């Protein structure tokens, strides 16, 4: 893909939240054009000044390990006002100005964001990218800051809802890791290592992983899953790590393990050797 890009492009961090846009009836809607449940957010953003803006609803720090879980809880609940009050809308487009090229729409957003910062409107910063080397350098900086990837835009592009094709290059996603979706087949309990602690040849402490010293710990260890599209080529595999899998969540999932089979779970992987 990278060899097919047409420069210059504008690049911004890929935010991992919930899509939010304000329609012409001044309602805050999701990507599926359904009203956002959080009453606090509807009250704050559902005004005529914001009609047409589109962005990503984010709770707290945009690069926090649990940003997606916390954002979902705050945005998709009707009764979590304290959480919802900490949500901001990171805006990147405006569909009411669809006849303008993207740079023109962005100028309009910039003026709006200056007026509306106290309401929780934040303009997503765009950086001009002129070469492949520029893109690689930018991606490295963004990933090191904790973002999962980069969004690329043609500054001359018209408005389009959703992502465009590689041929159009209006809006493209560029990230090192991809998201997959898998069906949960089963679960495995986590273990606590109670083998005797020893020192290795460098003087560092270590514990062996002898089975007799591995004790069940009452939390989720791994999900046994099968990918819906079989990206891995495996009949089944394990998912057991990730920034959102806190100790508390593992304990909750283990308590509810009887309900997990057949549910869908998202996971992140790096595709290797596939164009």
Q: Which residues does each PLM region occupy?
A:
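Covalent nucleotidyltransferase
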Residues: 2-122
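Active-site nucleotide/adenylate-binding loops and adjacent lid/helix of ATP-dependent enzymes
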Residues: 2-8, 128-144
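Short, structured patches in soluble enzyme cores that scaffold and shape functional sites
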Residues: 55-57, 91-96, 125-128, 154-156, ...
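HHCC-type zinc-binding knuckle of retroelement integrases
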Residues: 115, 123-128, 132-133, 152-153
């Amino acid at each position: 893909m990278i060899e097919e890009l047409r420069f210059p492009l504008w690049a911004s961090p890929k935010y991992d939240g919930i899509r939010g846009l304000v329609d012409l009836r001044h309602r805050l809607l999701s990507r599926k054009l359904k009203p956002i449940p959080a009453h606090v957010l509807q009250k704050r953003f559902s005004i005529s000044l914001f009609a047409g803006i589109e962005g990503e609803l984010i709770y707290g720090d945009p690069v926090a390990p649990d940003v997606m879980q916390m954002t979902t809880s705050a945005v998709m609940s009707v009764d979590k006002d304290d959480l919802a009050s900490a949500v901001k809308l990171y805006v990147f487009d405006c569909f009411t100005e669809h006849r303008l090229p993207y740079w023109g729409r962005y100028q309009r957003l910039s003026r709006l964001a200056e007026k509306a910062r106290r309401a929780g409107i934040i303009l997503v910063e765009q950086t001009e990218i002129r070469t492949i080397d520029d893109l690689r350098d930018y991606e490295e900086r963004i990933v090191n800051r904790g973002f999962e990837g980069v969004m690329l835009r043609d500054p001359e592009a018209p408005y389009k809802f959703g992502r465009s094709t590689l041929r159009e290059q209006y809006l493209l996603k560029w990230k090192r890791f991809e998201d997959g979706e898998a069906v949960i087949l089963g679960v495995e309990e986590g273990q606590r290592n109670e083998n005797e602690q020893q020192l290795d040849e460098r003087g560092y402490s270590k514990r062996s992983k002898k089975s007799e010293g591995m004790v069940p710990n009452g939390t989720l260890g791994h999900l046994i899953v099968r990918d819906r599209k079989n990206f891995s080529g495996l009949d089944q595999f394990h998912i057991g790590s990730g920034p959102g899998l806190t100790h508390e969540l593992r304990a909750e999932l283990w308590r509810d393990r009887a309900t997990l089979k057949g549910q869908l779970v998202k996971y992140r992987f790096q595709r290797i050797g596939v164009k």
